Amino acid sequence: MSKGTEGHFDTLPIGRLGLIPLNSSAALGKKVDDYLVSWRKGRGNEFAEKYVAAYEGYERDSYIIQSQVPRFGSGEAKGIINESVRGDDIYILLDVCNYSLTYSLCGYTNHMSPDDHFQDLKRVIAAIGGKARRINVIMPFLYEIRQHKRSGRESLDCALGLQELTAMGVENIITFDAHDPRVQNAIPLHGFETIQPAYQFIKNILRNAPDMKLDKDHLMVISPDEGGMGRAIYMANNLGVDMGMFYKRRDYSTIIDGRNPIVAHEFLGADVKGKDMIIIDDMISSGESMLEVAKLLKDREARNIYMCSTFGLFTSGLEKFDKAYEEGLFTKVLTTNVVYQTPELLSREYYISCDLSKYIALIIDKLNHDASISGLLDPADRIQKVIKKFKNHEKI
């Protein structure tokens, strides 16, 4: 990791940078912190006339602000900040899907749910007590994003969650691949950014598929449903290939586990025979839909199948994926490290983890200087550079 190589800014920071990774994102937070420390080493002295070298706390050995959320025996909790954050530009990082964390509830071991993580976030914000200059929340998997619209007498949990955060003083909310970005309409006067990791997916696929041919005759991008067409079109356009999609026929007369069951997947697109497939979606929950799509593509004689998803939840375990891999239904599964990854998942030979820590660090570095992040929201230039390297047989 080279020192002082990322970012040259013409503005002073909004405030002293402070990073608060909650326990759910401790490992990711450490990686983000390492990047920030490396980039800022020497930057203040090198550009003293712009940065003011003596700017308090600009260059530090760590930007992590120590915090904790201890619990009482009843399961109740409180947020604690262990150092001053007065005047700081705070970035709180959390993973609401990290079920590996536990706490004692009246003598019983209780795994933390998304609700628990969201409450802990609010506790930490409350502990800051309005003393920070600005509070930004980086929540890669947006809390309750799948409950973004109302069908009948239902609660709008995602909108309520966003409004709670802004009411507590949060100015910016950064998330990845929001299931429906229109939920930002709940907080139209506050910062809300949703980022797609298409660049990381393309880079990691090309690293692991040296024989892939990037043309319409040998590659297609597939959306497993109509809701994900936007991300599939974006990736297909950047790769210069065609896209196809499946739409789900559902039984609207039945409700199972809160949803109408899928009756069949119908395909719309060109012939897939002999072509490599990139299936891209926002999340793998149980994985049944993704595996069904892979099977249907294999039935149509597709070649290699790469399944990409920002969030690999694998709520029903890995057995179905293990079996499908043994049967040759797919080549690789790619998800990111912004949600909890089990040791079992990381050990699978078919699994590729896409690290987003540098991406998050870049966002924080720019926002702290109130600089534009447009180039990070649309990484088309970076994607084209990777594709050029791949075609020239250079190391990616």
Language-model segments: which ranges?
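PRPP-associated nucleotide enzymes
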Residues: 1-396
